[in-house]
């Protein structure tokens, strides 16, 4: 495999050839009978088979009976030296040994070849292109000795077929020889290597030598005695037992043919593609080309037989199933035999040997450049050119159970053989290739985060090793051989065992020291006090007047120090409390300081902190920053993550009753999963961040946390009261359930007077500490909040009406039009469903139904339609670029994840750099996005967040602008979202823009939200109000519906342009804080948002206008009456249509066919807006020239896909409105362009001056003129130089083509009604809506047979021909055919006309024919 520097690798081979050769010979051929004579370094021995050979002295012990014969030989030498002869007893003993070896030698060899069965990876049937190694590379490769462990492996273990026993780390060269130079010269002269003389003996089996000794299917060896004979493949090194092969299942003829012509294994018989993989691509050699024998082997006559066998038999890897020619593995004639034996023994290729583990992840890829471009193309390659790019790649992968430190580059073919599914999935993602200028793996993935356990040289781990003190164990860091660690930026379940880093790698070594010391801190942690802590000193002696010295993460503000002392006092008096500071004042820092004081002074731990999932990482970071001496653990994520924390950090192995941590941070979503663990321990302090989650005493979180044992409870919330006072009482009940009952307090304070108000404040005061930014921060940046009212686009209006009109029965129940038997809960659920659909429509119509989007439009027009579909996107396309140009950084909050998806597409279209996270984002993704946005000189200008997930507990003070896309029912959610930017650390004025749609449910939502804000600070009002009641939902739905269904509204649509948006931003930047009035501060009220009226910012709060002239109960009646009126019209049209179908009246038609209907009913309008009623004007592009012209005498084509149902008078339209109908309706209101004509049209040129004569108003607007010849085809819409952006109803392509041609050739084509040049069917004076006929392309009245196309027999015959080729259902075609036949059977009456008119018409026809002929000639 090519290395990372794209150089060819050297082929290496093991240095013990006998170890890999001996198992392939019979016992008689490898059992030494006696030693004949001895030289300096070799012995001449005789085997039981009668063969004599020279063997090195140090290799004699590898042969059977070699040591025994050596002892006999040494004994014989000693006797010969002293006595000069050998006794008869010695000869008898030698003969006895020979007999024993002959009888038992084969049995011993069979016992030594027993194997374990194992399974390999998936098969991949593709040929491997071999690596081409030159003779110089092979001969110059250096040799290296075998490892000592391999020499100590006994014969039985060495022959076991198991990947664990293969020498994967063998680094010796395959192409090298371990002979000296003198020995090489002698072997070249002899043409044979002395220890390979067996290969050239008579009757040597080369087939057996080139095949593996293990069955591919059952992994068993050959046993002839039991009938398990091998069947050898003729094309590769695979072998099968006869019963395991497919031969028994074949018929007799096929089986005989295979036995005569050779057996081909299933892998070779398949038509596998000869892919252009890495090695062949780089070297220019492929197995698909004509076979080229390396010259070093072709010139050797002694190897001719071996080379001939190697031409047809290739090595096939057991694991990846690739094949490769043996002589491409090693072209050195002195070592090729050793290389063949090495691979046959090992069973796997080089890449499988180096990387035995499965693939976990594919990270990147890169393309290899061929060293021989002329040879890189394959003549016999079955792979298409488009697939070559995938097979000429290298992939950067990570193995299972390995860290990112051990990633490696691998070939495409090897990866396909090991993990084909992963490769296909990765290739389908269309990832960009590897960029050498950027790191493939983030640095954080290779830095140690936590050390869970270690293993010392003694074999013991950190918990079983015995050390006297923590210092002794800390010094033993040099004894650590492996460590079980997690990595920064990765989840805990990706932890693995790794050797400690080297000291030269400073960053990794520093992290390793920190992780090891934290592990020891956890192991040597002191036991938590079990008894309650009693303090005899008065609190005045304990109070902090300055910041404690052990709090070193930063400087506490004066109000934060007061908050620390207040929490300390609550704990001192054993009184639970609520820290209710406004968002952005640093409640987290105050709580961490409080925990530090308890631990430093009183050794008070453990502490349990419950936080939202989005803020877990932030809490862990702040705890490590402000209290580094605390042992902190986080219980979050999947079960694998939490199990690691439980097993290695929380539960003390020596004393399971005590927890081995000071602070445990757990997400609120995991409390239920880990409740059994939390109940085991007595927690000194229980802290709940975002304590408003406990507002419902029936929630599971309230129930489970109430069962956790704790000495002191503390809640953190910036919004203690959100909807009603009962929620506030529930918080107090959670803190002190023994003294406070929420239900009783609610009954007690249901009726409020002055005395009870004072009493209620006395109850709440000991629990709360509430401060706002304006009270404690002097130079805090101001905040300007502005509501931007918008008008719905036509698409939104249509969908809005449709949603309300579809729920007739429900609306009748609400307004009292019909009796109802359904319960109130069912009605409330239905109302909520309607409300959600309306809110989706107001956010973006694509959220309501994705089918509204036309996916066949060009990209530019598709994005234009996306903007024009929603009024909020229309203002964003003006507002966001201007804010970015002014240097603002923006946070965009939405409650719909689908809207964030749409915004992502829009930002990509606008090339705006952004970050995003929502509820589905992982913890690492969230923190990474926050860090990237807050980084100095960050290129990100926008941040997309969901209101619920991104509105709590995160710091985004680097942003100075907040845009709320859709208001929340709970105003505190929006306030928390705003507080992400308007918080401590902000240095700029914060601009807040809230987008709301006028005359819609959003107005009522904002109004109700303002009431809740008032309730938050004026508890005495509306205590018994239920804001989720059916009445409130009805009022929200009712709001705006009256104005929407009014036939003529007095108020115009709100319009915004670049000037008005520029003025909006400028005025907002000049305004002061919306809540800086002293009266608001003293009364502790929230300031209301100000409303932009397109001229200035109103100082009044947002007031919702209600029409007091109409009774509230009559709103739905107006809607119902309108819907019933429409239904009656539909019914009347249907009855009339049926009546016309039954009455077959004969209608008079003229002979001539006029393609233009020039009557006064034709209406054309100028569409100079984005869409009808849109407040955002867009410039209309005019057509300046035509690049292509008319074809040569082309006839009008009729689309065969036209729905023939429209010919029938029986109409099935106007059925129940569903989502599909709404999608079609909305599509017709979006920006659309005519689609390409499905017929091939040949265009020719035409003189414009001649065309002007043809298209003059003299001929076009004459109602008496009728065409006699075939209609002329006009060029399609796409050929016009400047694309005219159409917004409006979708029109017929023929109508648009005719209109654009005539309007571009002549300036006199104007409407006869209004005198304006406009699109067909868009006349502003039109009262009766006309429809465009799909047959003739002209507008005319429907309901009668008025189409000019039906007046001409030739046109009717064309329609019948087109109908016969149509794919419409047979019954529809039958009806349409009968209809057309009825037109043909009607009597024709001559047209009565005066002679003057006849002469005038004939003269016009003659002039027109001459003009057309002249145009054709040109």
From Swiss-Prot:
Location of the protein in the cell: Nucleus; Chromosome, Centromere; Chromosome, Telomere
Subcellular location, principal: nucleus
E.C. no: 3.6.4.-
Zinc finger (RING-type) residue numbers: 215-269
Helicase C-terminal domain boundaries: 875-1034
Keyword Zinc: yes
Residue stretches of biased makeup (Low complexity): 135-148
One Gene Ontology term from the biological process aspect of the record: subtelomeric heterochromatin formation
Enzyme class, first EC level, given as a word: hydrolase
Annotated ATP binding sites: 581-588
GO cellular component, as recorded: chromatin; heterochromatin island; mating-type region heterochromatin; nucleus; pericentric heterochromatin; rDNA heterochromatin; SHREC complex; subtelomeric heterochromatin
Swiss-Prot/TrEMBL keywords: ATP-binding, Centromere, Chromosome, Helicase, Hydrolase, Metal-binding, Nucleotide-binding, Nucleus, Telomere, Zinc, Zinc-finger
Family annotation (InterPro entries): Chromo-like_dom_sf, Chromo_MIT1, Helicase_ATP-bd, Helicase_C-like, P-loop_NTPase, SNF2-like_sf, SNF2/RAD54-like_C, SNF2_N
Domain of life of the organism encoding this protein: Eukaryota
Gene Ontology molecular-function annotations: ATP binding; ATP hydrolysis activity; ATP-dependent chromatin remodeler activity; chromatin binding; DNA binding; helicase activity; histone binding; nucleosome array spacer activity
Region ranges (Disordered): 135-156
PHD-type zinc finger span: 212-271
Helicase ATP-binding domain sequence ranges: 568-738
Self-association state and partner proteins as the record states: Interacts with clr3.
Function as written in the Swiss-Prot or TrEMBL entry: Required for proper positioning of nucleosomes at heterochromatic loci and for transcriptional gene silencing (TGS) function of the Snf2/Hdac-containing repressor complex (SHREC).
Family listed: Belongs to the SNF2/RAD54 helicase family.
The protein's name in its UniProt record: Chromatin remodeling factor mit1
Organism whose genome encodes this protein: Schizosaccharomyces pombe (strain 972 / ATCC 24843) (Fission yeast)
Encoding gene (name): mit1
């Amino acid at each position: 495999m090519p290395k990372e520097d794209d150089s060819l690798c050297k082929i290496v081979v093991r240095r013990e050839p006998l170890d890999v050769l001996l198992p392939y010979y019979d016992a008689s051929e490898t059992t030494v009978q006696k030693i004949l004579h001895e030289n300096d370094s070799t012995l001449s021995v005789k085997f039981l088979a009668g063969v004599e050979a020279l063997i090195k002295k140090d290799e004699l012990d590898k042969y059977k009976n070699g040591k025994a014969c050596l002892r006999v030989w040494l004994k014989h030498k000693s006797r010969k030296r002293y006595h000069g002869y050998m006794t008869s007893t010695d000869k008898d003993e030698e003969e006895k040994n020979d007999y024993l070896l002959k009888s038992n030698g084969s049995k011993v060899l069979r016992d030594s070849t027993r194997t374990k069965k194992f399974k390999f990876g998936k098969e991949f049937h593709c040929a491997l292109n071999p690596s081409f190694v030159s003779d110089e590379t092979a001969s110059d490769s250096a040799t290296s000795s075998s490892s000592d462990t391999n020499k100590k492996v006994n014969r039985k273990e060495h022959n076991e077929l198991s990947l664990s026993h293969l020498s994967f780390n063998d680094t010796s060269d395959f192409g090298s020889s371990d002979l000296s130079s003198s020995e090489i010269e002698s072997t070249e002269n002899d043409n044979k290597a002395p220890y390979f003389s067996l290969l050239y003996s008579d009757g040597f089996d080369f087939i057996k030598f080139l095949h593996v000794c293990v069955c591919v299917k059952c992994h068993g060896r050959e046993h002839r005695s039991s009938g398990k004979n091998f069947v050898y493949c003729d094309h590769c090194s695979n072998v099968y037992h006869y019963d395991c092969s497919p031969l028994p299942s074949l018929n007799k003829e096929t089986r005989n043919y295979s036995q005569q012509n050779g057996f081909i294994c299933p892998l070779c018989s398949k038509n596998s593609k000869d892919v252009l993989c890495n090695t062949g691509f780089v070297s220019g050699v492929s197995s698909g080309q004509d076979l080229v024998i390396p010259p070093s082997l072709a010139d050797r006559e002694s190897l001719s037989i071996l080379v001939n066998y190697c031409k047809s038999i290739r090595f096939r890897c057991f694991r990846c199933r690739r094949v490769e020619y043996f002589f491409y593995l090693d072209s050195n004639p002195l070592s090729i035999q050793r290389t063949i034996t090495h691979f046959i023994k090992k069973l796997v290729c080089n890449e499988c040997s180096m990387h035995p583990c499965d693939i976990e992840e594919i990270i990147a890829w890169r393309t290899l450049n061929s060293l021989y471009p002329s040879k890189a193309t394959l003549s016999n390659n079955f792979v298409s050119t488009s697939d070559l790019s995938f097979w000429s790649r290298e992939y950067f992968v990570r193995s299972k159970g390995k860290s990112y430190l051990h990633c490696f580059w691998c070939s495409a073919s090897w990866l396909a053989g090991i993990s084909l599914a992963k490769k296909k999935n990765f290739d389908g993602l269309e990832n960009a290739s590897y960029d050498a200028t950027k790191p493939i793996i983030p640095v954080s993935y290779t830095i140690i985060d936590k050390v869970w356990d270690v293993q010392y040289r003694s074999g013991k781990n950190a918990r079983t090793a015995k050390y006297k003190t923590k210092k002794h164990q800390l010094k033993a860091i040099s004894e650590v051989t492996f460590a079980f660690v997690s990595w920064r930026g990765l989840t805990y379940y990706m932890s693995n065992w790794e050797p400690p880093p080297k000291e030269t790698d400073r960053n990794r070594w520093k992290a390793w020291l920190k992780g090891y010391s934290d592990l020891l801190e956890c192991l040597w942690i002191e036991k938590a006090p079990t008894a309650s802590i009693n303090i005899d000193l008065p609190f005045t002696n304990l109070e902090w007047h300055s910041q404690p010295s052990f709090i070193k993460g930063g400087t506490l503000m004066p109000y934060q120090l007061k908050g620390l002392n207040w929490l300390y006092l609550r704990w001192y008096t054993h009184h639970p409390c609520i820290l209710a500071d406004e968002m952005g004042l640093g409640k987290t820092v105050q709580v961490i300081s409080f925990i530090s004081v308890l631990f430093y002074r009183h050794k008070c731990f453990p502490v349990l902190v419950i936080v939202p999932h989005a803020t877990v990482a932030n809490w862990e970071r702040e705890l490590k920053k402000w209290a580094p001496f605390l042992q902190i653990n986080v219980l979050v994520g999947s079960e694998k993550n939490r199990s690691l924390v439980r097993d290695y950090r929380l539960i003390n192995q020596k004393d399971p009753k005590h927890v081995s941590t000071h602070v445990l941070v757990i997400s609120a979503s995991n409390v239920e999963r880990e409740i059994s663990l939390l109940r085991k321990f007595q927690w000194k302090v229980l802290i709940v961040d975002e304590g408003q989650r406990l507002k419902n005493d029936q929630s599971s979180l309230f129930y489970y946390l109430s069962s956790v044992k704790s000495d002191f409870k503390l809640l953190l919330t910036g919004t203690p009261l959100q909807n009603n006072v009962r929620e506030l009482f529930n918080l107090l009940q959670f803190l002190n359930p023994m003294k406070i009952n929420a239900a009783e307090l609610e009954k007690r304070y249901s009726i409020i007077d002055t005395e009870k108000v004072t009493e209620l404040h006395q109850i709440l005061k000991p629990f709360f500490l509430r401060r706002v930014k304006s009270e404690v921060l002097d130079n805090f940046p101001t905040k300007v909040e502005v509501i931007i009212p918008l008008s719905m686009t036509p698409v939104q209006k249509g969908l809005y009406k449709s949603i309300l009109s579809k729920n007739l029965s429900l609306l009748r129940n609400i307004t009292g039009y019909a009796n109802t038997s359904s319960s109130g809960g069912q009605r409330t659920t239905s109302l909520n469903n309607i409300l959600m659909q309306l809110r989706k429509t107001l956010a973006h119509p694509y959220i309501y139904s994705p089918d509204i989007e036309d996916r066949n439009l060009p990209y530019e027009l598709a994005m234009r339609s996306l903007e024009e579909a929603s009024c909020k996107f229309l203002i964003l396309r003006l507002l966001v670029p201007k804010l970015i140009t002014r240097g603002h950084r923006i946070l965009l909050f939405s409650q719909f994840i689908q809207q964030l998806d749409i915004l992502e597409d829009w930002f990509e279209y606008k090339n705006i750099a952004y970050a995003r996270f929502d509820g589905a984002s992982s913890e690492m993704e969230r923190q990474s996005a926050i860090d990237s946005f807050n980084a100095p000189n960050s290129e990100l200008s926008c941040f997309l967040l969901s209101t619920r997930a991104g509105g709590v507990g995160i710091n985004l003070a680097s942003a100075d602008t907040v845009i709320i896309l859709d208001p929340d029912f709970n105003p505190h959610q929006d306030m928390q979202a705003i507080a992400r930017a308007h918080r401590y650390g902000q240095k700029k004025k914060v601009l807040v823009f809230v987008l709301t749609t006028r005359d819609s449910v959003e107005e009522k939502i904002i109004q109700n939200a303002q009431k809740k804000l008032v309730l938050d600070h004026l508890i005495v009002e509306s205590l018994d109000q239920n804001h989720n009641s059916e009445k409130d939902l009805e009022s929200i739905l009712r709001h705006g519906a009256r104005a929407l269904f009014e036939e003529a509204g007095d108020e115009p649509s709100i319009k915004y342009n670049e000037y008005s948006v520029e003025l909006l931003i400028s005025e907002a930047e000049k305004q002061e804080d919306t809540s800086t009035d002293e009266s608001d501060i003293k009364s502790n009220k929230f300031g209301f948002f100000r409303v932009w009226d397109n001229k200035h910012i109103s100082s009044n709060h947002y007031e919702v206008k209600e029409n007091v002239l109409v009774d509230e109960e009559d709103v739905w009646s107006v809607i119902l009456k309108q819907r019933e009126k429409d239904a009656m019209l539909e019914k009347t049209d249907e009855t009339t249509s049926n009546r016309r179908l039954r009455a077959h009246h004969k209608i008079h038609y003229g002979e001539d066919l006029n393609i233009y209907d020039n009557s006064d009913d034709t209406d054309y309008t100028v569409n100079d807006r984005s869409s009808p009623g849109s407040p955002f004007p867009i410039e209309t592009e005019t057509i300046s020239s035509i690049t292509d012209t008319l074809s040569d005498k082309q006839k009008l084509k009729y689309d065969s896909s036209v729905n023939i149902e429209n010919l029938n008078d029986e109409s099935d339209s106007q059925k129940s409105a569903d989502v599909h109908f709404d999608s079609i309706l909305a599509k017709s209101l979006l920006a659309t362009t005519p689609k390409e004509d499905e017929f091939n049209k040949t265009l020719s040129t035409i003189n414009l001056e001649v065309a002007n004569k043809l298209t003059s108003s003299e001929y076009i607007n004459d109602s008496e003129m009728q065409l006699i010849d075939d209609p002329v085809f006009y060029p399609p819409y796409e050929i016009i130089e400047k694309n005219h952006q159409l917004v409006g109803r979708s029109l017929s392509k023929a109508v648009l083509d005719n209109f654009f041609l005539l309007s571009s050739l002549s300036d006199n084509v104007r409407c006869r009604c209004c005198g304006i040049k406009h699109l067909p069917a868009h006349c502003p004076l039109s009262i009766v809506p006309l429809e465009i006929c799909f047959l003739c392309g002209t507008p005319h009245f429907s309901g009668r047979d008025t189409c000019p196309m039906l007046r001409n027999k030739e046109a009717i015959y064309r329609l019948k021909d087109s109908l016969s080729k149509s794919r419409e259902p047979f019954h529809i075609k039958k009806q349409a055919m009968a209809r057309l036949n009825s037109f043909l059977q009607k009597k024709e009456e001559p047209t009565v006309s005066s002679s003057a008119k006849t002469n005038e018409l004939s003269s016009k026809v003659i002039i027109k024919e001459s003009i057309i002929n002249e145009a054709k000639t040109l």
